[in-house]
From Swiss-Prot:
PANTHER family: POTASSIUM CHANNEL PROTEIN 2-RELATED (PTHR43833:SF13), POTASSIUM CHANNEL PROTEIN 2-RELATED-RELATED (PTHR43833). A motif (Selectivity filter) lies at residues 46-51. Its main location: membrane. This is Probable potassium channel protein 2. InterPro entries: K_chnl_dom (IPR013099), NAD(P)-bd_dom_sf (IPR036291), RCK_C (IPR006037), RCK_C_sf (IPR036721), RCK_N (IPR003148), Trk_Ktr_HKT_K-transport (IPR050721). It comes from Methanocaldococcus jannaschii (strain ATCC 43067 / DSM 2661 / JAL-1 / JCM 10045 / NBRC 100440) (Methanococcus jannaschii). GO terms for molecular function: potassium channel activity. Residues 107-227 form the RCK N-terminal domain. The chain crosses the membrane at residues 8-28, 62-82.
Length: 343
């Protein structure tokens, strides 16, 4: 049991014992209650001024029992108080009290459920961008360690994030978003269901270890599902097989397909000498308007221009990198292949 809880229990027991003894002595010895209370306190603390002593046999017997039991309890109480102060428990108590007061005033904040490796990355990003959040984890040591790094920006609650009372402590009814990064997919599904029930409007982003869990988390109420293993695996495959400046884009487009069922593709198109687009500016070519595809960048020999300006002039040999739906990219392919009209 924590020192603070033991301190409260022993303190309540001591006060109850003092008041009860005072009441009994006032009746047995026939004195007023204040005098009896005064005698009760100086007796249990072994002060013993001697200005008042029980006169009856019953009063003296009760005092002997009171001394045997009460002195031990009070001495234990004093030792707990000393431990509470010396071990920094009092300082921690004050700190937690301040933290609870801060949490009570929060609104439009985020709740990170599970402060492991992934949750920690999310938290540090939020701290960097001054986004208010509360971290929830069952491991108090991990939370304390993080608090010591960011004492002014890190708020936390020790507990099981799947439980309603813990989420309510984190003010889920006033939260803007919840990040579910618990260890298992089953835990994240249960957490998502609970969070969605407590706040139907909250934005929930959940972690999925298995690909099959993505669908289940969405059914449970997650707005977005992220699979770290899927992202990491695709990224490693891309940089191994197709290393280059745009490999990461194809990775995330693949993720968009797998996780969000978005029909998006990334392709490259070469401008030929007789292409209608050759020697036209991007503004005049109006690729976006004609095809719906978005140009990410243009490679010219060894140089690469990301997000080129509208005044950029297309030349033969330029490689256009664009993304869009299959239909968008088909229109762009036809536009690139379209020949110039001969005069």
């Amino acid at each position: 049991m924590e020192t603070s809880k033991k301190l409260v229990i022993v303190a309540v027991l001591s006060i109850t014992l003092i008041l009860t003894y005072a009441y009994l002595i006032s009746i047995i010895e026939g004195v007023d209650y204040f005098t009896a209370l005064y005698f009760s306190v100086i007796t249990i603390t072994t002060t013993g001024y001697g200005d008042f002593t029980p006169k009856t046999f019953l009063g003296r017997t009760l005092t002997v029992v009171y001394l045997c039991v009460g002195v031990g309890i009070v001495m234990y109480l004093f030792s707990l108080i000393a431990e509470f102060i010396v071990e920094g428990k009092f300082e921690e108590f004050v700190r937690l009290k301040k933290m609870k007061n801060k949490i009570k005033t929060l609104k439009d904040h985020y709740i990170i459920c599970g402060y492991g490796r992934l949750g920690k990355v999310v938290g540090e990003k939020f701290i960097e961008e001054n986004i208010p959040f509360i971290a929830i984890d069952i491991n108090e040591d991990v939370l304390k360690e993080e608090y010591e790094k960011y004492p002014d920006k890190f708020l936390y609650i020790v507990g099981d994030a799947k439980k309603e009372e813990v989420l309510k402590k984190a003010k889920i009814d006033k939260a803007k978003g919840l990040i579910a990064t618990l260890p298992s997919d089953a835990d994240n599904v249960f957490l998502t269901l609970t969070a969605r029930e407590l706040n139907p409007n909250i934005l929930i982003t959940a972690k999925a270890d298995e690909k099959e869990a993505i669908r289940k988390l969405k059914i449970a109420g997650a707005n977005r599902v992220v699979s770290p293993y899927l992202i990491g695996g695709l990224r490693m495959a891309e940089v191994s097989v197709r290393p280059g400046i745009l490999d990461f884009l194809s990775t995330f487009i693949k993720i968009a397909k797998d996780e969000y069922e978005e029909d998006i593709e990334l392709r490259k198109f070469v401008i030929e000498k007789d292409s209608e687009l050759a020697y036209k500016s991007l503004k005049d070519a109006n690729i976006r308007g004609k095809t719906g595809a978005t140009i990410l960048g243009i490679r010219r020999e060894k140089e690469f221009c990301i997000n080129p300006y509208p005044e950029f002039i297309l030349k033969p040999g330029d490689v256009i990198y664009a993304f869009g739906t299959e239909e968008n990219l088909k229109y762009l392919e036809n536009l690139v292949k379209k020949k110039k009209k001969k005069l």
